[in-house]
Amino acid sequence: MQQHKQLVVILETAIIAAFAMALTYIPHTTGVSAIELNYGLIPIAVLAMRRGLVPAAWAGFVWGILDLILRGIGGGSVLNPLQGILEYPIAFTLVGLMGLTFASFQKAVRGSEKVKASGYAFAGIIIGTFAKYFIHFIAGVVFWGAYAPKGTNVWVYSLIVNGGSALFSTVLTIVVVGVLLTVAPQLFVAKDGKSFSTKAA
């Protein structure tokens, strides 16, 4: 039975990673050039609140590897091995930090405290998203500085691009997760109660 539950978590993690990758192909560039909406963060957020930090981190890692192979290398977004590792497996894995609020979220959602549950979910989303884009911000300064518009400070340019992407993606994810919490709260509660993170009280 225990092995079956673990298999279910692994399958959910793999499905979420694949779904996040699929969402990446939806056009997602907004007004200012290079600022993007990251739809893939939405399923990772759901998994983080449903299963915890470790499954979410693994889903992020797999998503990062897929994005590296399917888009990064072929799309010219990998300048060298160090930058590729930093901006794909590492940055995407950090999205799993959304699961830091898993235990508190589960306690709230199981107690039908929707306002508290929303607050914990939103806090986790902010942590995970900004952790990811902090890595992109550093990489933007170190590796992408030469591509900044002439006369533009590389720190400022990277902050605008990556900070803007983080902000837009965070707002999008919070809105969608908020709607899902209202219309389908059961989506965030695993029937088997299994996680590889801190257990809800």
From Swiss-Prot:
Keywords associated with the record: Cell membrane, Membrane, Transmembrane, Transmembrane helix, Transport
UniProt-annotated location(s): Cell membrane
Major localization class: membrane
Database matches in Gene3D superfamilies: 1.10.1760.20
GO molecular function, one term: thiamine transmembrane transporter activity
Record's GO cellular component terms: plasma membrane
Top-level taxon in the UniProt lineage: Bacteria
Pfam family for this entry, one: Thia_YuaJ
Bilayer topology: Multi-pass membrane protein
InterPro entries in UniProt: Thia_Transptr_ThiT
Transmembrane segments: 7-27, 29-49, 53-73, 85-105, 124-144, 170-190
Quaternary context: In Lactococcus lactis subsp. cremoris (strain NZ9000) forms a stable energy-coupling factor (ECF) transporter complex probably composed of a membrane-embedded substrate-binding protein (S component), two ATP-binding proteins (A components) and a transmembrane protein (T component).
Alphabetized NCBIfam families for the sequence: ECF_ThiT_YuaJ
Function as written in the Swiss-Prot or TrEMBL entry: Thiamine-binding protein that interacts with the energy-coupling factor (ECF) ABC-transporter complex. Unlike classic ABC transporters this ECF transporter provides the energy necessary to transport a number of different substrates. The substrates themselves are bound by transmembrane, not extracytoplasmic soluble proteins and transport it into cells. Binds thiamine with a dissociation constant of 0.5 nM. Upon coexpression with its energy-coupling factor (ECF) ABC-transporter complex EcfA1A2T in Lactococcus lactis subsp.
Family of the protein in this entry: Belongs to the vitamin uptake transporter (VUT/ECF) (TC 2.A.88) family. Thiamine transporter subfamily.
Name of the protein in its database record: Thiamine transporter ThiT
Name of encoding gene: thiT
